């Protein structure tokens, strides 16, 4: 009797595993995860949006499982027993059941969404590198990149300040000459009408003219310096927006390509008459190496720095 129960549990586990590897499950689940994972990050704070998306995911999982279990005649008790059996505790089975467990456990769900978001970003970056040969500066990792960005920004700032100083000096010289010319023009009527007061008039004219050479218009110098800096901030903000838009386009295109590939693979599988469970072999996801984790951390630090620059500006 015990052997029969074990055989029944084993059959239920294998049936569920076959369904979870098949297109009826994997296509809608993968589409949902890829479309919704963009807003997930590894911050400790759980946003309200996360909860709403998790509820949508839970409803999708329940609908798919309920339909399948009715088709093959497995009741809820059998399903629960199969999920808690030793056969479902292996690493292979846990990897297969992760999307199901994520519907009940928000922590598992969030980790799954963060992992998929990271995977999508890395795939988009690889596509950019393959097509362009090199990565944009904002997508290369490491502290050296941040340093390069800062150095480039300093070069731009110095150049802007240099040009600003030249323009300021030219403007000051032009105003000085204009004021000298106006001062001389005012002296002529005074010389014609009062010859006796010529020396005094000239003294007044010189007194008026000389300070003009060092005339400082309040706020002008400050405004001249702030203008280029403001332009620089606008330039950097616009550049960041363009980069973000560029990466989003690549991401959307990648999702479209992946969806088309899945549809074609599904059609090919149906034409050959093979069950999806036989076509797809379950593979365990390799854990990230320390180097990959370090690379990911550096990329996230850079992304946060760029995000702060955009928000602050």
UniProtKB/Swiss-Prot annotation:
It comes from the Eukaryota. Pfam families: ARL2_Bind_BART (PF11527). It is found in: Nucleus; Cytoplasm; Cell projection, Cilium, Flagellum. Residues 179-189, 271-292 have a biased composition (Basic and acidic residues). Residues 165-204, 262-292 are annotated as: Disordered. Its main location: nucleus. The modification Phosphoserine is found at residues 85, 147, 201. Keywords: Cell projection, Cilium, Coiled coil, Cytoplasm, Flagellum, Nucleus, Phosphoprotein. One of its GO terms (cellular component) is motile cilium. Residues 147-187 form a coiled coil. Residues 192-203 have a biased composition (Polar residues). May act as an effector for ARL3. Belongs to the CFAP36 family. Interacts with ARL3. This is Cilia- and flagella-associated protein 36. It comes from Bos taurus.
């Amino acid at each position: 009797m015990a052997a029969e129960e074990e055989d029944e549990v084993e059959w239920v586990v294998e049936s569920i595993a076959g369904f979870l590897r098949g297109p009826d499950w994997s296509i809608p689940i993968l589409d949902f995860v890829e479309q919704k994972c963009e807003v997930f990050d590894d911050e400790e704070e759980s946003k309200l949006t996360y909860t709403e998306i998790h509820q949508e995911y839970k409803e999708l999982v329940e609908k798919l499982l309920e339909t399948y279990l009715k088709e093959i005649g497995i009741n809820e008790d059998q399903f629960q027993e199969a999920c808690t059996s030793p056969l479902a505790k292996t690493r292979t089975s846990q990897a297969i059941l992760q999307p199901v467990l994520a519907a009940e456990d928000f922590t598992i769900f969030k980790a799954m969404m963060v992992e998929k978001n990271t995977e999508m970003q890395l795939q988009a970056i690889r596509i950019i590198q393959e097509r362009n040969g090199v990565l944009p500066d904002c997508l290369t990792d490491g502290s050296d990149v941040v340093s390069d960005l800062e150095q480039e920004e300093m070069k731009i700032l110095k150049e802007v300040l240099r040009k600003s100083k030249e323009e300021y000096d030219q403007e000051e010289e032009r105003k000085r000459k204009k004021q000298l010319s106006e001062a001389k023009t005012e002296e002529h009527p005074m010389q014609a009408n009062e010859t006796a007061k010529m020396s005094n008039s000239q003294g007044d004219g010189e007194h008026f003219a000389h300070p003009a050479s060092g005339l400082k218009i309040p706020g002008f110098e400050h405004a001249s310096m702030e203008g280029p800096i403001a332009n620089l901030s606008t330039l950097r903000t616009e550049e960041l927006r363009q980069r973000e838009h560029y990466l989003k386009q690549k991401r959307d295109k990648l999702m479209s390509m992946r969806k088309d590939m899945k549809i074609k693979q599904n059609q090919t599988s149906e034409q050959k008459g093979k069950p999806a469970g036989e076509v797809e072999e379950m593979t365990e996801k390799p854990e990230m190496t320390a180097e990959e984790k370090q690379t990911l951390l550096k990329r996230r630090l850079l992304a946060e720095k760029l995000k702060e620059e955009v928000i602050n500006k």
